[in-house]
């Protein structure tokens, strides 16, 4: 997750550099306002994926997590593409023990 974020932040794309800089600045501000360390963000991402995976099969290669912030609040945006809905709830590793 962190490596994907860094690649997205610093990758060269067809967009102009002003748009890239604005997007990076928004992400930095949102991270700062949230008070979440990169380690906490990664742990939260892992737990969200674990819980959602009990009910649906998700495409891990296409997942996106981001923080968006305005003057009033910070929002965690999770985009988890669903491959299929599970017929029964999958057991988590904690439940299997």
Curated annotation (Swiss-Prot):
Keywords: Cell cycle, Cell division. It holds the Pfam family MinE. Gene3D superfamilies: Cell division topological specificity factor MinE. It comes from the Bacteria. GO terms for biological process: division septum site selection; regulation of division septum assembly. GO terms for cellular component: plasma membrane. The keyword Cell cycle applies. Transmembrane segments: none annotated. Prevents the cell division inhibition by proteins MinC and MinD at internal division sites while permitting inhibition at polar sites. This ensures cell division at the proper site by restricting the formation of a division septum at the midpoint of the long axis of the cell. Belongs to the MinE family. This is Putative cell division topological specificity factor. The gene is minE.
